[in-house]
């Protein structure tokens, strides 16, 4: 089983399935079990259990086995968790996040922004010229927005992720 005390793994799973889903993962019974059994043993609502299982299945962390009851013909779905690929998933997520941060950093560094003092909008220079430097929402004069602090924060995040 995966180390659920690891901050990174815990944070990643929480972002996928939320707090109730994480509670379900922590208390998940061993072996193949039905969603009803999981709900009964973990105390998590059945709808939440099902939603969590499908999210985990989409991310290749849950395996489902279908069995047909020979008497009734009904299908039973048996679930178990498999986090053997979580390190690979975390690396993919890190690369995706890093790529998005670099794209945003490049955008912020290469554009000039103007904002409404009332907080209505933030516009690119070209958009601001189209509105004659007036807020399209309230008509207030737009002012230059110095995004250097935000650029600095983005650079630190990119650097931290690149070195990790």
Swiss-Prot record:
This is Transcription factor E. Keywords: DNA-binding, Transcription, Transcription regulation. Pfam families: TFIIE_alpha (PF02002). Transcription factor that plays a role in the activation of archaeal genes transcribed by RNA polymerase. Facilitates transcription initiation by enhancing TATA-box recognition by TATA-box-binding protein (Tbp), and transcription factor B (Tfb) and RNA polymerase recruitment. Not absolutely required for transcription in vitro, but particularly important in cases where Tbp or Tfb function is not optimal. It dynamically alters the nucleic acid-binding properties of RNA polymerases by stabilizing the initiation complex and destabilizing elongation complexes. PROSITE patterns: HTH_TFE_IIE. HAMAP family: TFE_arch. The keyword Isomerase does not apply. Residues 5-87 form the HTH TFE/IIEalpha-type domain. One of its GO terms (molecular function) is DNA binding. The gene is tfe. Belongs to the TFE family. Monomer. Interaction with RNA polymerase subunits RpoF and RpoE is necessary for Tfe stimulatory transcription activity. Able to interact with Tbp and RNA polymerase in the absence of DNA promoter. Interacts both with the preinitiation and elongation complexes. The winged helix domain is involved in binding to DNA in the preinitiation complex. GO terms for biological process: regulation of DNA-templated transcription; transcription initiation at RNA polymerase II promoter. It comes from the Archaea.
């Amino acid at each position: 089983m995966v180390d659920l005390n690891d901050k990174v793994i815990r944070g990643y799973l929480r972002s996928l399935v939320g707090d109730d889903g994480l509670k379900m993962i922590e208390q998940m019974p061993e072996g193949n079990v039905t969603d009803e059994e999981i709900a009964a043993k973990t105390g998590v609502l059945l709808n939440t259990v099902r939603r969590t299982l499908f999210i985990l299945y989409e991310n290749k962390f849950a395996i489902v086995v279908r069995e047909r009851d020979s008497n009734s013909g009904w299908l039973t779905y048996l679930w178990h968790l498999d986090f053997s690929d979580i390190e690979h998933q975390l690396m993919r997520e890190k690369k995706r996040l890093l790529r998005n941060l670099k794209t945003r950093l490049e955008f912020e560094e290469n554009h000039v922004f103007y904002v409404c003092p009332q907080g209505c909008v933030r516009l690119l220079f070209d958009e601001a010229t189209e509105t004659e430097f007036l807020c399209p929402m309230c008509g207030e004069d737009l002012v230059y927005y110095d995004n250097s602090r935000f650029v600095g924060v983005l650079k630190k995040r990119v650097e931290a992720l690149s070195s990790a």
